[in-house]
């Protein structure tokens, strides 16, 4: 192998190492922002929120009919949260909720949610959101062992009332659940 090939390989590896360093620096910056947003939402909430679970829907393409026929898709429950809107108009929330899961057993969840918010109409009360939630849940069929969750969020709302939703991905006969709730801001 001639010298130019060694230089090319060394240069390629060196550039990759520099890139990895930048990725970790950005990850550290992102985590700092994440922690600061949680702290600010906890310390300076603008609203108190009431959460009312509305629907759980198991994707029919991903389940046997005999399973979906047995599942609960009316998730009785409720929750409470703190929230705020940041200077960009994005929503931040801390919440705790408990609801009846697919097996009609209680499932608690608590976490932080963030949504980038758009107000596409002249009426500023109408808003759409897209973001994520990070938290912890526990299920009866997992012996209530705390499980971390990182899920997408989407919403449509008017004024203090928001219909918020997520999708829990999964495999055949497991996961693939649409879950939605109403959020009322006070």
From Swiss-Prot:
Listed result of changing residue 101 to A: Drastically reduces palmitoyltransferase activity while leaving expression and membrane insertion intact
Lineage: Bacteria, Pseudomonadati, Pseudomonadota, Gammaproteobacteria, Enterobacterales
Known catalytic reactions: lipid A (E. coli) + a 1-hexadecanoyl-2-acyl-sn-glycero-3-phosphocholine = hepta-acyl lipid A (E. coli) + a 2-acyl-sn-glycero-3-phosphocholine; lipid IIA + a 1-hexadecanoyl-2-acyl-sn-glycero-3-phosphocholine = lipid IIB + a 2-acyl-sn-glycero-3-phosphocholine; lipid IVA (E. coli) + a 1-hexadecanoyl-2-acyl-sn-glycero-3-phosphocholine = lipid IVB (E. coli) + a 2-acyl-sn-glycero-3-phosphocholine
Effect of residue 172 to A: Does not cause significant structural perturbations of the enzyme, but induces a 2-fold increase in the palmitoyltransferase activity
GO molecular function: O-palmitoyltransferase activity
Keyword Acyltransferase: yes
UniProt keyword terms in alphabetical order: Acyltransferase, Cell outer membrane, Membrane, Signal, Transferase
Resulting phenotype, residue 113 to M: Mutants with longer amino-acid side chains at position 113 preferentially transfers laurate chain (12:0)
HAMAP family linked: PagP_transferase
Sites marked Role in the phospholipid gating: 172
Induction remarks: In magnesium-deficient conditions.
GO cellular component: cell outer membrane
EC top class named in words: transferase
Quaternary structure annotation from Swiss-Prot or TrEMBL: Homodimer.
EC number: 2.3.1.251
The protein, known as: Lipid A palmitoyltransferase PagP
Note, other: Overproduction leads to camphor resistance and chromosome condensation.
Subcellular location(s) of the protein: Cell outer membrane
Protein activity control: Inhibited by lauryldimethylamine oxide (LDAO) and dodecylphosphocholine (DPC).
Family per similarity comment: Belongs to the lipid A palmitoyltransferase family.
Residues at the site labelled Role in lipopolysaccharide recognition: 67
A Pfam family recorded for this sequence: PagP
Catalytic residues identified in the record: 58, 101-102
GO biological process: lipid A biosynthetic process
